[in-house]
Amino acid sequence: MSLMFSSPVVTPALGSFTFSSRPRSNYIVMSAVRSNSASTCPILTKFQKDCATPTPYLRNVANAIADDMRDGLAVEGGGDLEMILTFVDALPSGNEEGLFYALDLGGTNFRVRSVQLGGKKERVLATESEQISISQKLMIGTSEELFGFIASKLANFVAKEKPGRFLLEEGRKRELGFTFSFPVKQTSIDSGTLSKWTKGFKVSGMEGKNVVACLNEAMEAHGLDMRVSALVNDGVGTLAGARYWDEDVMVGVILGTGTNACYVEQKHAIPKLRSKSSSGTTIINTEWGGFSKILPQTIFDLEMDETSLNPGEHLYEKMISGMYLGEIVRRVLLHMCETSDLFGHFAPAKLSTPLALRTEHLCKMQEDNTDDLRDVGSILYDFLDVEANMNARRRVVEVCDTVVKRGGRLAGAGIVAILEKIEKDTKRMGSGKRTVVAMDGALYEKYPQYRQYMQDALVELLGHKLASHVAIKHTKDVSGLGAALLAATNSIY
């Protein structure tokens, strides 16, 4: 059986995407099957209907996210979105000079980086980085053990610096931008208390403690003459790193295993900001994964949520981020096996195993354009121990596309909510000024169908005229540079 494609295959360039002011035609991403029409399988037809995100529905989602943004800016806990004050009131200008460092802690590895900055003309003169694994023992040990280990590795990293490439100005202490990707209540640019551990960490004696103080004390104990100048998360680091190269960057979005977004906000639009000055701008960390209103939840989303580590929380994240897309597909396929003959008269045992299908598998199956979908068949055989006929392979890809289409379009609605909030206060796009969204994360980078669905939603909601002034830029791994730059921007010298 051969597959028919309705349009020529074109894949958008990943580095940057600017929307045309005219409607596009004949522009789709390669996909074995797209969920544009209802399936002949009743279970799949209902699932597609439950996941549908037509433009009017997406508009309601974007409006609800915008309402939550305003509520969160008005008062702490005002809405699903926390709208956290980051205290980043100054972004990199390009004038920064000197040697600065970045530490990124957010999973089973941490990364350290050194950056020698040469000002407007020379920008980044030199940079080095190193990634170090964190053992399971340290992840559930004490704060002294974890931060002591990090400080010792930082000291080793500094000791290996090549004198000809990196130069610390005499009389200055080394300064560090600390990317700490765990829930924190930030109290200033260089202090914040841990709310709770996530991602498998359960370090004792830390909750409610100032994470910056813990790291500073550990560095001092190891004889390292270094201090934390800026505490940020990966979204803020991405925005700052991208802004260094492009002054039109206004939004930073992470779409990977997890998801988050931050943006440049006018201080006068933040009622909960109790400061003497309401002029200028600051960066808001939306924590948009916590959004939960009017989302197209299915029985499979509800089941997955009930068995998650945080039931009832972060429902938006569970629909749009890479950690969950494969698991939703697995649950749908299991139900189809149990109620139909998708893979014959039995459900493969591996299909009952949580996380047996990962988002990277969905991507590979959707990119299969062979006549017999042989790559789909190989993935199903290798990871689920099932030999699927052509009809089953097509059904599987339809399920993948349905889940990914919903995720990409919902992510697009979230970005539109932020862009429209910025537009309301600044009238940037309406006056023809370019607005850039800096994107990072493996889901955005490696899943072309997801990217396309997200971009489609942006154009549908903004309209072609406003969308033509929006640029989506893939800015891989700039959060480390951004953290170092924020250390420079907030230097005590």
Swiss-Prot record:
A GO term for molecular function: fructokinase activity
One Pfam assignment: Hexokinase_1
Entry binding sites for D-glucose: 198-199, 233-234, 260, 287, 317
Keywords for the protein's UniProt record, in alphabetical order: ATP-binding, Glycolysis, Kinase, Nucleotide-binding, Transferase
Leading EC class: transferase
InterPro entries: ATPase_NBD, Hexokinase, Hexokinase_BS, Hexokinase_C, Hexokinase_N
Keyword Transferase belongs to the record: yes
Binding-site residues, ADP: 107-109, 257, 442
EC number: 2.7.1.1
Function: Fructose and glucose phosphorylating enzyme.
Identification of the protein by name: Hexokinase-like 1 protein
Taxonomic lineage from the root: Eukaryota, Viridiplantae, Streptophyta, Embryophyta, Tracheophyta
